[in-house]
């Protein structure tokens, strides 16, 4: 699937949209760098998230720490031009 992170300006909320297919319900976990060689499971999900507490810059950036559970799939986050 594909997930998009859009932010019009540093002061505007981040809009997260995407569609991933074949997944059971799980947490959504993103790392700047990571090993995606440990992939398994096939699943599906649609998501759209936005809010003033989401930002891609500064102290309040989307860096959240927690336990999302076992990895069921992995992907690469890149910048589209």
UniProtKB/Swiss-Prot annotation:
Principal location: secreted
Gene3D superfamilies: Superoxide dismutase, copper/zinc binding domain
Cellular localization per UniProt: Secreted
Keywords, ordered alphabetically: Hormone, Secreted
Any one GO BP annotation for this protein: chitin-based cuticle sclerotization
GO CC field: extracellular region
PANTHER family per UniProt: SUPEROXIDE DISMUTASE CU-ZN -RELATED (PTHR10003)
Subunit details: Heterodimer of burs and pburs.
Protein name: Bursicon
Gene it is expressed from: burs
